[in-house]
Amino acid sequence: MSQEATEAPAMPGEGHGHNKAKARWLLGTDRKRSRINRTRQDLWEDTSWSNHRLSRATSAPRGTRARGTAHGRSEASPENAARERTRVKTLRQAFLALQAALPAVPPDTKLSKLDVLVLATSYIAHLTRTLGHELPGPAWPPFVRGLRYLHPLKKWPMRSRLYAGGLGCSDLDSTTAITTGQRCKDAELGSQDSVAAESLLTSPAFGNK
């Protein structure tokens, strides 16, 4: 009995040790969890930082490429400007040469490109009719027929004839054409009358009278 009484008080001590071991186990579990959480957080931070650096590294070539493209454009723009100036100069020289080839136009006349084209069309049509060839199309296209109303008489006194047939009579302005034709006929009749009068004065019969 005394031995049982002596061993009986040992039970509470064993329970306290068990509780203490359980507390240590729980503390160790909490520490492991906190370590795992810290590890996960560190991994997340490292991953986000790596992604950030990767995005910056990816965007850097784009910016460099954009700056390179802009730099290339700035280098090419003077060449484009030079080509455009050359094209405009060549076109202007061609129109000046075409205007110089047209008769009945004073050398220092200032005409627009449209005026030069209308005069050239009129002159070509006049030469075609003079050679007895038929025109491949209408002598005056519809867009040319109304130009006399868009271009009033300006720097050149003969400009009114520019849209009245230029060098010849056309159906662009019938009134001007009829007037010009009548003047030509009057000039021809006057020359014929003067020739007849001279022949009459120099004839022997007139001298005998």
Swiss-Prot record:
Chain spans, region Disordered: 1-20, 54-85
Keywords: Developmental protein, Differentiation, Myogenesis, Nucleus
Expressing tissues: Highly expressed in the uterus (predominantly in myometrium), ovary, and testis. Expression in the uterus is higher in the diestrus phase than in the estrus phase and reaches a maximum at 7.5 dpc. Expression declines towards the time of delivery and returns to the non-pregnant level 4 days after delivery. Low expression seen in lung, heart, intestine, and spleen.
Record Pfam families: HLH (PF00010)
GO annotation, cellular component aspect: euchromatin; nucleus
Compositionally biased intervals (Basic and acidic residues): 72-85
Tree of life domain: Eukaryota
Keyword Nucleus: yes
InterPro entries membership: bHLH_dom, E-box_TF_Regulators, HLH_DNA-bd_sf
Domain annotation bHLH: ranges: 75-127
Subcellular location, record wording: Nucleus
Gene Ontology MF, one: protein dimerization activity
Biological process annotations from GO: cell differentiation; decidualization; muscle organ development; negative regulation of muscle cell differentiation; negative regulation of transcription by RNA polymerase II; positive regulation of gene expression
Subunit record text: Forms inactive heterodimeric complex with TCF3.
Domain free text: Both the bHLH region and the C-terminal portion are essential for inhibitory function.
Free-text function comment from the UniProt entry: Inhibits E-box-mediated binding and transactivation of bHLH factors. Inhibitory effect is similar to that of ID proteins. Inhibits the formation of TCF3 and MYOD1 homodimers and heterodimers. Lacks DNA binding activity. May be involved in the regulation or modulation of smooth muscle contraction of the uterus during pregnancy and particularly around the time of delivery. Seems to play a role in the inhibition of myogenesis.
Name listed for the protein in its UniProt record: Transcription factor 23
